[in-house]
């Protein structure tokens, strides 16, 4: 070899070795969890992100930043849609106080109106007077008689309210709104969008059972969500015998087996039929709806509990982007499960 070339080649090799040996290994994603109580229920969030040092170097939020961001989302929604916060926008609207509506209220209202129209009124946020009358809100009292429930029906109906110039207009001042069947789904979506906007695309958000799974885990596995098996008692331990795999999809479960009151030996379920003014009666114990967003899944889970299984299945034929797992009682009183065909490949049984 030409000695004049050997020395430069050796130096280049030495420099390359030095660069490789001194370069820092790429920071790896780590698993983080957030848990707490909010909106009268729990939240559980799992996400994959860099540790604080690596996140700061990459100009990404730290764990404290993420917690503060999520807390601010909960706070903004509570100040807008809470029935238990007397100073919320919703409380003021229900009290007929002239109030300028913010975008959170308008977005939820518009979504609710869209699903009311889509379900022919089976989903309806104007059922608040009936929910209060049956004692499912923060007020207690004897259950309404058939005549009393009928008298409240005149104030129920999504076509009796509208937004104009950022203010709510009611046909009757007695009409009140309840966003509980859609607000938690909306909250779940907001948190997921917040995480994704900060490059945290592998995460799962659960707000009171309204779940959204974003992307896959770093190892390539899909997120797995358990579906609760209905029980005969409110206080019975939760049991799960079914898992569903999700990716960029939401699942929301609605059921009456834990949400009811008993008066004079009569069980009143919390799902109110907006058309009759009475609790829904059918064989359906619970329904778990999958949808592109938690807002959609939340609204439809409630609507399906009003419809019953047969009508819900007919709805899904027309709208295949929505699928469901139904748990119901057959004619012999046995608990059965029926799964939409499109979901069967995603279902696992827990032994």
Predicted regions and their residues:
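Mature catalytic core of soluble alpha/beta enzymes
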Residues: 2-10, 16-351
């Amino acid at each position: 070899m030409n000695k004049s070339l050997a020395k430069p080649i050796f130096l280049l090799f030495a420099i390359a070795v030095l660069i490789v040996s001194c370069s820092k290994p790429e920071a790896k994603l780590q698993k983080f969890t957030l848990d707490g109580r909010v909106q009268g229920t729990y939240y559980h969030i799992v996400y994959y992100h860099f540790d604080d040092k690596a996140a700061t170097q990459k100009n990404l939020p730290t764990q404290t930043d993420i917690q503060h961001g999520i807390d601010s989302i909960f706070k903004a929604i509570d100040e807008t849609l809470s029935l238990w916060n007397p100073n919320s926008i919703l409380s003021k609207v229900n009290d007929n106080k002239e109030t300028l509506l913010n975008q959170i209220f308008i977005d939820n209202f518009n979504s609710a109106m869209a699903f009311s129209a889509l379900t022919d009124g089976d989903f309806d946020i104007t059922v608040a007077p009936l929910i209060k009358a049956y004692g499912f809100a923060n007020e207690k009292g004897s259950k309404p008689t058939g005549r009393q429930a009928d008298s409240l029906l005149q104030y129920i109906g999504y076509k009796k309210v509208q937004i104009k110039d950022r203010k709510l207009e009611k046909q009757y001042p007695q009409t009140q709104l309840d966003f509980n069947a859609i607000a938690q789904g909306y909250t779940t979506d907001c948190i997921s969008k917040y995480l994704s906007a900060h490059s945290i695309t592998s995460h799962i958000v659960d707000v009171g059972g309204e779940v959204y799974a974003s992307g896959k885990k770093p190892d390539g596995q899909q997120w797995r969500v358990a579906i609760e098996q209905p029980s005969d008692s409110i206080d019975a331990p939760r049991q799960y015998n079914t898992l569903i795999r999700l990716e960029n999809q939401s699942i929301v479960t609605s059921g009456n087996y834990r949400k009811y009151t008993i008066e004079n030996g009569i069980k009143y379920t919390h799902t109110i039929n907006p058309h009759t003014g009475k609790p829904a009666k059918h064989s359906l114990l619970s329904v778990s709806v999958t949808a592109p967003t938690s807002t959609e899944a939340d609204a439809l889970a409630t609507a399906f509990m009003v419809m019953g299984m047969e009508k819900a299945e007919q709805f899904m034929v027309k709208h295949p982007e929505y699928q469901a797992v139904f748990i119901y009682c057959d004619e012999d009183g046995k608990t059965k499960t029926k799964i939409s065909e499109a979901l069967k490949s995603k279902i696992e049984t827990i032994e």
